[in-house]
Structure formats: C-alpha cells, structure tokens
A protein has these predicted regions:
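C-terminal transmembrane helical hairpin of 12-TM major facilitator-type secondary transporters
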Residues: 106-112, 118-119, 123-175
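Extracytoplasmic gate region of multi-pass secondary transporters
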Residues: 58-119, 203
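Interfacial helix-cap and linker-helix signal at transmembrane-aqueous boundaries
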Residues: 91-92, 122-123, 207-215
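Symmetry-related core transmembrane helices of the 12-TM Major Facilitator Superfamily/SLC fold
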Residues: 1-15, 219-237
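A late C-terminal transmembrane helix in Major Facilitator Superfamily
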Residues: 180-214
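Small-residue-rich transmembrane alpha-helices and their cytosolic helix-loop interfaces
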Residues: 105, 109, 136, 189-197
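Flexible cytoplasmic inter-helical loops of multi-pass small-molecule transporters
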Residues: 19-53, 244-248
Length: 248
C-alpha cells in the first residue's frame, strides 16, 4: 500500500508541481503585488544565472558554512530520531506501562503537526537564526527532562519533542534558502538534505549502540544532551545570511 501511495504522489508531483511559481502563472511568495512582467523578466534572468552558477554540489561540499549548517540543524534531526526510536524502551525502563508510553508517544506525534506550524510562525516573526537557537535550547531542555525521574518533566518534554519533530526539517529549508537564496537553493539543498538524512540515521544507530552498553538508556540521553549543546553552539556561529552577493 505504501508503495502505491508513493507512486501516486510521484505522478501528482511530476504532473502538477513546478520548481517556481512563475511557471504556473503565480507570484514569488504568492504576493500579487509583484509586477508580473518585471517578475517574469527577473525569473528568466535568474534561470540564465543558474546555468553558470558556481554553487555546484562539489562547491557546496567544500564550503565551511554548509558543514556548520549540517551540525546546527542536523543535530535536531539526530535527536528527534534518536529519541523516537528509543522512546518506548526508555520510559518502560523508567517504570511506565506500555499503554501509557504509547499514549505519550501519540501526544508527541499529534503535537508535531502544529509544532511545525509554530516553528514556521517563529521563523517569520523573530527570524531564522533566533528560531534555530530556540529549538536547540528546547532540545537540550527536553533531554534534561527525560534524564530525570520526575513524571511532570517527562510530560513537559512531549510538546518540546513535538516542536523538534515538526520543526527540524522546516529549519533546514529556511536556513538553506536564507544562505543560498531562492535559485541556488536547489543546488545547496540537494547536498544538505542527504547529509541531514545521514545525521538522522546516525542518531538511531548511536542510541541503539548506547542502549546495548547501558540498559537504563541514560547514557544515550547524556550523549544527546552533549549533542544539543554542540548544535546550539553551531547555530550561534552560523551566519544565516546570503553567502555572497551573487546568490539569488
């Protein structure tokens, strides 16, 4: 069934989705205040620019800011997948019954939907970098809550986890767009997204390895707390601004 759904979605995307709104008669950011002819001319000029853009995959991989971005935002994905893959085991070891743990997991999953919206709203209101810093701080707080044996703190960690789940992918898109612009975004994101997938996969692997060493699951959460601090430092260092004057 999943494969059938994936095929259907793929067909819909191929037929109806385009890279730019201008290709479907729309406006950048869905803003009709744009001068249509001017926007069209700028779009054509940008497409010509892309033909000679220096931001190839190799160039992106050689760029330090790409790797700082990977650490700053990728770690939230590392933690999200690490926590989710370990959630049931962790809380059952701490004395929770399986139905309660599944209920908690369901709460976090449901809240991830509005969590994504909240992250998008914060991105617009306070800026991408500040939002990224906030998410990394919250990630650290969530892990600390889970390191305790205080039930109230465990439940407090759930909406924070939801924001991490719903917002980490949003933040990667926002940061990439802010740094490489609207047109070079495609080249940069084609590099950073696979790297991000590696980070999330590593999160699951590291947590599993830690649990084989420490059945209480505390070691895994201590490591994730350290990772959260590293991610926070990277986000503070990351320049969320156009990487040069040429990107569009």
């Amino acid at each position: 069934e999943t494969a059938v759904i994936a095929v259907i979605v793929g067909i819909v995307v191929i037929v109806f989705v385009r890279d730019f709104p201008e290709e479907k008669g729309g406006y950048p950011d869905n803003n009709p205040a744009f001068d249509g002819e001017k926007a069209k001319a700028e779009h054509q000029a940008a497409l010509e620019y892309l033909k000679t853009s220096k931001w190839t995959a190799l160039k992106c991989l050689k760029t330090g800011r790409m790797w700082v971005l990977w650490i700053a935002v990728g770690i939230t994905g590392f933690m999200s997948m690490g926590i989710m893959s370990n959630f049931v085991t962790k809380f059952m070891v701490m004395g929770y019954e399986l139905p309660t743990v599944l209920q908690m997991l369901g709460i976090a999953g449901v809240l991830a939907i509005p969590g994504s919206i909240v992250v998008g709203w914060l991105d617009v209101k306070i800026g991408t970098k500040k939002t990224g810093i906030l998410i990394n701080v919250l990630a650290f707080v969530a892990v600390l809550c889970c390191l305790t044996h205080v039930t109230v703190l465990h439940y407090i960690s759930l909406p924070i986890l939801a924001v991490m789940l719903g917002g980490s992918s949003n933040l990667m898109v926002s940061c990439t767009a802010a740094i490489w612009g609207r047109y070079d975004f495609k080249n940069a994101f084609s590099v950073i997204q696979p790297l991000n997938s590696v980070m999330t996969g590593v999160g699951i692997t590291v947590v599993s390895a830690c649990n084989s060493i420490d059945p209480t699951c505390q070691l895994a959460y201590i490591i994730m707390a350290v990772m959260a601090v590293i991610g926070l430092i990277a986000m503070c260092v990351l320049k969320v601004e156009p990487i040069d004057s040429e990107v569009r």
